[in-house]
């Protein structure tokens, strides 16, 4: 079945290559673009909320519409093309700058994962999105090169939404794999691959972020798409790695699939979107993080990077559960049980945490660093917010709750 699927994917790619217009490529500097994900440890961070906006990362951008905007689709819809273009262009040019990349390097990081939506490279007629993000992604690659960082380009939003989350660009029903959406996604992926696969700084491209198999994404169809994405990258540059999301399935359940290929599994780990997890003690949070490594990532036959995780121990951050939704932690989300108070945890800085909260946050972060480096490494979510305590790496670093050197430990050997 998969052999036949691979043949179909290659045929589709040949048609893409024949019909596609020339796409500018990010220049090479003569250095190798490879990073050995089988032997080297990824230590990095995501640039969430920049080229794909999210209400909880930049709430002021969404609040400025006067209400009703719940994702980038509705943000652009409410503002209209001209105003959306102006607001988003201002955001892209100011939210992340070269100094951010310099600070990442100073923190000992070696990777940055940069989300981008399909509409930036393969817009679809009739949709409200605006484009222009790709120029900033090009600039980011230049900044990363200067800072000595490798880049993972992440296709974060797919046509129809691959997960129904606001981070896909369009909150609501999952319609990816309906109609022509998979082919449209491949067109977007191919545009990114042709632009970046031969860069000396982009070592990997992610096929699609968080396709939601429990939510209805067909796993066999997803695998077919992965075959096509791998063929595309390999055709352009065999040393460029394909990152594949586990689709919210146990990462070891993908064993045997594409084994031996230049691929890395991407798994995401949060302990705040489930009431059972929110009720745990700090000791249990640590044990849960460690068990992700021992029971799952270490059991994979491929490199595994924990591509998203957080220092937050609550879901209190404003709009984290979506505009219009409150928090499970304080019992205001639907009919959940109250576990604690969100005061001081919805907005602001970890500087305002109590001494115990600070200690628990540092301990939890260190446990995750230890656990995720037992396999192939990690990418923290996210580098910068407008004030989401526990989620903002810059804020955590400034307050010594994230190690200022990735190997520095105040709480060593928690997973031993």
Curated annotation (Swiss-Prot):
GO CC entries: cell surface; extracellular region
GO BP, one annotated term: cell wall organization
GO molecular function, one term: glucan exo-1,3-beta-glucosidase activity
Cellular compartments annotated: Secreted
Enzyme Commission (EC) number: 3.2.1.58
Disulfide bonds: 290-415, 316-342
Main location: secreted
Cofactor: Mn(2+)
Known glycosylation sites: 183
Enzyme class: hydrolase
Catalytic activity: Successive hydrolysis of beta-D-glucose units from the non-reducing ends of (1->3)-beta-D-glucans, releasing alpha-glucose
Alphabetical keyword list: Carbohydrate metabolism, Cell wall biogenesis/degradation, Disulfide bond, Glycoprotein, Glycosidase, Hydrolase, Manganese, Metal-binding, Polysaccharide degradation, Secreted, Signal
Signal peptide: 1-22
Gene3D superfamilies for this protein: Glycosidases
Highest taxon of source: Eukaryota
Active site: 210 (proton donor), 308 (nucleophile)
Quaternary data: Monomer.
Function: Beta-glucanases participate in the metabolism of beta-glucan, the main structural component of the cell wall. It could also function biosynthetically as a transglycosylase.
Family: Belongs to the glycosyl hydrolase 5 (cellulase A) family.
PANTHER family membership: GLUCAN 1,3-BETA-GLUCOSIDASE I_II-RELATED (PTHR31297:SF1), GLUCAN ENDO-1,6-BETA-GLUCOSIDASE B (PTHR31297)
Annotated protein name in UniProt: Probable glucan 1,3-beta-glucosidase A
Organism expressing this protein natively: Aspergillus niger (strain ATCC MYA-4892 / CBS 513.88 / FGSC A1513)
Lineage of the organism: Eukaryota, Fungi, Dikarya, Ascomycota, Pezizomycotina
């Amino acid at each position: 079945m998969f052999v036949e699927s691979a043949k179909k994917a290659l045929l589709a790619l040949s048609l893409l290559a024949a019909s596609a217009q020339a796409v500018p490529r990010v220049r090479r500097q003569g250095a190798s673009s490879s990073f050995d994900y089988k032997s080297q440890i990824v230590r990095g961070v995501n640039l969430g909320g920049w080229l794909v906006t999210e209400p909880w990362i930049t709430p002021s951008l969404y609040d400025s519409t006067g209400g009703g905007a719940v994702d980038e689709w509705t943000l652009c819809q409410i503002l209209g093309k001209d105003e959306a273009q102006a607001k988003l262009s201002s955001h892209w040019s100011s939210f992340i700058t070269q100094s951010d990349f310099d600070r990442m390097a100073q923190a000992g990081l070696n990777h940055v994962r940069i989300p981008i939506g399909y509409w930036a490279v393969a817009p679809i007629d009739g949709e409200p999105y605006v484009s222009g993000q790709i120029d900033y992604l090009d600039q980011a690659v230049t900044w990363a090169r200067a800072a000595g960082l490798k880049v993972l380009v992440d296709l974060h939003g797919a046509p129809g939404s691959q997960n129904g989350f606001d981070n896909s660009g369009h909150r609501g029903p999952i319609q990816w794999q309906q109609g022509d959406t998979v082919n449209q996604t491949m067109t977007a992926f191919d545009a990114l691959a042709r632009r970046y696969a031969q860069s000396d700084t982009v070592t990997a491209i992610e096929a699609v972020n968080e396709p939601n198999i429990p939510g209805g994404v067909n796993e066999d169809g997803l695998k077919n798409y992965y075959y096509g994405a791998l063929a595309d990258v390999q055709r352009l540059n065999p040393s460029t790695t394909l990152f594949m999301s586990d689709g919210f399935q146990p990462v070891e359940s993908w064993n045997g699939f594409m084994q031996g290929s230049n691929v890395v599994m991407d798994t995401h780990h949060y302990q705040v979107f489930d009431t059972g997890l929110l009720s745990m003690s700090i000791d249990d949070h640590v044990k849960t993080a460690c068990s992700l490594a021992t029971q799952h990532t270490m059991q994979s036959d491929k490199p595994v990077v924990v591509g998203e995780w957080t220092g937050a121990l609550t879901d209190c951050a404003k709009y984290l559960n979506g505009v219009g939704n409150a928090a499970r932690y304080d019992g205001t989300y639907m009919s959940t049980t109250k576990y604690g108070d969100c005061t001081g945890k919805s907005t602001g800085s970890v500087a305002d945490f109590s001494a115990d909260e600070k200690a628990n946050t540092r301990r939890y972060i260190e446990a995750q660093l230890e656990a995720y480096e037992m396999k192939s490494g990690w990418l923290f979510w996210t580098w910068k917010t407008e004030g989401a305590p526990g989620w903002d790496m810059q804020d955590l670093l400034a307050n010594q709750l994230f190690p200022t050197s990735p190997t520095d430990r105040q709480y060593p050997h928690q997973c031993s």
